[in-house]
Amino acid sequence: MQRRGALFGMPGGSGGRKMAAGDIGELLVPHMPTIRVPRSGDRVYKNECAFSYDSPNSEGGLYVCMNTFLAFGREHVERHFRKTGQSVYMHLKRHVREKVRGASGGALPKRRNSKIFLDLDTDDDLNSDDYEYEDEAKLVIFPDHYEIALPNIEELPALVTIACDAVLSSKSPYRKQDPDTWENELPVSKYANNLTQLDNGVRIPPSGWKCARCDLRENLWLNLTDGSVLCGKWFFDSSGGNGHALEHYRDMGYPLAVKLGTITPDGADVYSFQEEEPVLDPHLAKHLAHFGIDMLHMHGTENGLQDNDIKLRVSEWEVIQESGTKLKPMYGPGYTGLKNLGNSCYLSSVMQAIFSIPEFQRAYVGNLPRIFDYSPLDPTQDFNTQMTKLGHGLLSGQYSKPPVKSELIEQVMKEEHKPQQNGISPRMFKAFVSKSHPEFSSNRQQDAQEFFLHLVNLVERNRIGSENPSDVFRFLVEERIQCCQTRKVRYTERVDYLMQLPVAMEAATNKDELIAYELTRREAEANRRPLPELVRAKIPFSACLQAFSEPENVDDFWSSALQAKSAGVKTSRFASFPEYLVVQIKKFTFGLDWVPKKFDVSIDMPDLLDINHLRARGLQPGEEELPDISPPIVIPDDSKDRLMNQLIDPSDIDESSVMQLAEMGFPLEACRKAVYFTGNMGAEVAFNWIIVHMEEPDFAEPLTMPGYGGAASAGASVFGASGLDNQPPEEIVAIITSMGFQRNQAIQALRATNNNLERALDWIFSHPEFEEDSDFVIEMENNANANIISEAKPEGPRVKDGSGTYELFAFISHMGTSTMSGHYICHIKKEGRWVIYNDHKVCASERPPKDLGYMYFYRRIPS
């Protein structure tokens, strides 16, 4: 095996208590029962500490337990030893040194370094032409820190040698967790660091590409060595082509090519002809810049001809990222960036905002010793541990240090370079919080708002004692429904975690400019001329707030006063104000062609926000409540049978309809549920289901089978005992509420009948006098995947009511045409100035684009 051969050519380690050759076998004998060879399915962590972001690149290296295969930095390995008694660890360390200089002053050319055997990312800040890497491995025995240099094939027992070799050759643990989830995780090309690029003056235009040999205009690949544009073949893209890109490689030997039309600020499709597989190029931006391509301004289209929306987005990308402005990097505690794992910017932006809130800082980082000391044996699978790890990584300043001054670099490089790690990789955190979620566990771009609610749900489910930091977002919404004919009203309350503001397009203050721009744009498109400068709709924030507070019609409203359907209107007000108010601008909608689109608007979001006028007032004098009577719906037996039979076996779901909906930008699981609950009646019917249900808290949750009859009884024990713990399956609740019954009524009926749908319907018909149980309040969380049930008077500060006056302290912006594509960044106000967090880059903001945000975070101003 190549890695084993590389390891066995490596010199011994240094710095600990070394053993004489004759003592090694005797020393290991007591520990042999604890040393394991990794089996299939074991997760071997050799790149990242379970409690910190230490790695083999760190000064203290990384210790891998030879029993659990968990990894620990120097500050945390003793904790694991004390807790488990495991004594044998493999210590991994990567050294970075300056290359030996030749007589002319340049670095001597070297062959491929055989001393590299760890699968680690290289330091992007170091020029690989000037530095070389050397990996070191050794066994360390605790508590005396005896060191056994590797390789030591003659002295070590065979089992230990095999175990060491298996650990070093193991693959990423994230692939083993769920192969389907991480199928898009690509290897870094071995040619990326030292790729030769010819200085031949080639510059690639932004469009109009064609193959240099056959004039094809699709499936084109740019060779990153000489800039040749040639057509591909089925080997990677499954598209048509004559294989000229592959022929060019065979003629010239230039290994890497990037597919034109896939280049975005987040990356591109790169193929290695030599390695014969898709790869990652960590220096892709530099390699493309060699041919005049700026990744920050690229947006993927198949043939390079930019559509209308693509052209409009250019300005958006530049403004939000503050391109063209020399931004000053910031370092230290609270100024640590998060590396992009490939469309993980939605997660990074939300977590930066979350950990700028003192309550989250105290709950996790403030309790770090206790959380780490009492973490389970596998801390990689514990939410609170991973939240604390991430929070400490962001707030400690340990991974955000300014570069060393040039004179100090010279002194350091004479011996050994000690690289400063800037930015942390949230791979372990993302793997855990997205586990079992079909969307967040993928490498696709996601909606930051949906992830925020998903995170709130995880915080709720994993609260630390009575402390729940997500309570700062929690508030009550009062919904008032009025029968237009009788004027009688009904008041209900629900829990929410964010305020969704509609975009009041009709209130644009520059309508004349917009009309003129649209005419000019269409004329330019028709005549194939350059498009005019973008004119963005300017929407007053007050208009959006007014649209939020205006009454809305209730479809199919059944008036209990009339005992019949009638016109009804609903208004929403705040029954309580949260400590931190999250405002989402509803920029995304659907066109007449079902294609998702984004409102490209500018909204004058205020720094100071006062919404006290939206405080709920409850039942007013003179108002009369609607009778609490259920609709007298009679369902014939044959209709019940049809209802049961329309739910098909999940294995029979029409996948073609699912994919039609998914291509419109809807979450895959939502599409599957839409097709399932509409009985495979086609994409159009399923689309209507999506439109009706897309605001529901479990919209993007995986499809789970409801129980009927005996199956429901058997499944009841899975969901818990009766009472508050027995939450009925959401699918059955949705079926009953779709018939016109109240949600609370449906839940109480299902609980009374052990989640049996037929018996629940009979129960409802036999209890027309249904009254809501006063012992509990059903709260429909606006959450990505949970409905939380709490008592009417819950223990602890579940709602932190107060003044409705707020100050803006953070906002998340989205660039692109859909939440399923594009890029997110975050701006946070710290120490009196705005800071931009763009993945791993953290800089002082010069022009924070507060008018183009997607999610806004406000903190209450004490009254």
Swiss-Prot record:
It catalyses: Thiol-dependent hydrolysis of ester, thioester, amide, peptide and isopeptide bonds formed by the C-terminal Gly of ubiquitin (a 76-residue protein attached to proteins as an intracellular targeting signal). The modification Phosphoserine is found at residue 114. The active site is at 345 (nucleophile), 823 (proton acceptor). PROSITE patterns: UBA, USP_1, USP_2, USP_3, ZF_UBP. It comes from the Eukaryota. Changing residue 664 to E: Impairs ability to stabilize SIAH2 and STAT1. Abolishes ability to stabilize SIAH2 and STAT1. Gene3D superfamilies: Cysteine proteinases, DNA helicase RuvA subunit, C-terminal domain, Zinc/RING finger domain, C3HC4 (zinc finger). Transmembrane segments: none annotated. The modification Phosphothreonine is found at residue 122. It is found in: Cytoplasm. One of its GO terms (cellular component) is nucleoplasm. There is a cross-link at residues 311, 405 (Glycyl lysine isopeptide (Lys-Gly) (interchain with G-Cter in SUMO2)). Residues 336-861 form the USP domain. Its EC number is 3.4.19.12. Belongs to the peptidase C19 family. Deubiquitinase that mediates deubiquitination of target proteins such as BECN1, MITF, SKP2 and USP10 and is involved in various processes such as autophagy, endoplasmic reticulum-associated degradation (ERAD), cell cycle progression or DNA damage response. Component of a regulatory loop that controls autophagy and p53/TP53 levels: mediates deubiquitination of BECN1, a key regulator of autophagy, leading to stabilize the PIK3C3/VPS34-containing complexes. Alternatively, forms with NEDD4 a deubiquitination complex, which subsequently stabilizes VPS34 to promote autophagy. This is Ubiquitin carboxyl-terminal hydrolase 13. It comes from Homo sapiens.
